[in-house]
């Protein structure tokens, strides 16, 4: 599936943000012999390669960044990731509870359990400073992890 589409939410139109309406992508996997289920675990599109490889009985290379999410097909409660990253006009770090939208020096922070429509920006509220610092550190670690791969793009 493609990304979502804004229809005026957050004063935005079309696909121009990293808010939930635009960044969340439905994923449907149909595997012969597996019962239908709905999973709510976080995943990234980069997880499709190792997942399809595993389902086809192929060896998954150890140096890829995606994670095999096929375990969710047997147990919908399986959690593969504690956070997922999206990027566009900024970066989104999404955990089950939090959404950090990072635009460099500015940003947005939302409690997705209590504010799933992302209306109450907590980014500059002092009582969320520890949560914000923890999520920023997690985002930085994720970006470092992404940068450490065997792809030498300078040779392309």
Where does each model-flagged region fall?
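Extended hydrophobic/aromatic segments used for targeting, binding, or gating
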Residues: 12-22, 27
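C-terminal cap/loop subdomain of S1 sulfatases and analogous C-terminal strand-loop tails that border
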Residues: 3-9, 30, 35, 44-113, ...
């Amino acid at each position: 599936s493609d990304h979502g589409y804004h229809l005026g939410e957050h004063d935005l139109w079309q696909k121009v943000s990293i808010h939930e309406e635009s960044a969340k992508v439905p994923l449907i996997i149909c595997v012969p012999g597996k019962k239908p289920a709905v999973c709510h675990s976080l995943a990234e599109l980069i997880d499709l390669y190792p997942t399809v490889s595993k389902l086809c009985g192929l060896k998954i290379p150890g140096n890829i960044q995606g994670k095999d999410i096929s375990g969710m097909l047997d147990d919908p409660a399986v959690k593969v990731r504690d956070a997922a990253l999206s990027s566009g006009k900024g970066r989104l770090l999404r955990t089950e509870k939090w959404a950090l939208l990072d635009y460099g020096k500015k940003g947005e922070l939302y409690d997705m359990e209590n504010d799933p429509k992302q209306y109450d920006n907590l980014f500059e509220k002092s009582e969320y400073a520890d949560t914000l610092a923890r999520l920023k550190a997690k985002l930085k670690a994720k970006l470092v992890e992404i940068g450490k791969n065997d792809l030498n793009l300078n040779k392309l």
